Amino acid sequence: MSGPFWLEKQALLMLHSESLAEHGGLCGLRDEGLLDSALARPQNLKAYAPDADMAALAAAYGVGLARNHPFADGNKRAAFLAVGLFLALNGWRLVATPVEATQIMLGVASGELEEDAFAAWIRDHVRER
């Protein structure tokens, strides 16, 4: 494999819109630069740490989106969806209950859970597809 399949901005924007339609929240992108920054985090990680595994790269997406707050609403949901989509694109399936997902993303967004700890949590919650 030449490298991971990265998330496209348009795919994440669609996921975010669908999430808002299903769960509610304010529509809109608050800061496109913050979105671009969050989407670039895993690629930068891979460039500087070539041995970073899929969980570390997925965690970089999750942390970047949850903490950058690029959307008007639904940032934690978008972050978790991005983690799941990235893993799925690369042959993995994230397995977590809604309660687990909520708790982990609250910890990520607040800064209580560091990126390495989030990556470890992801490793414990993925299965090969």
Question: What are the functions of these language-model segments?
Answer:
Residues 1-129:
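FIC/Doc superfamily catalytic core
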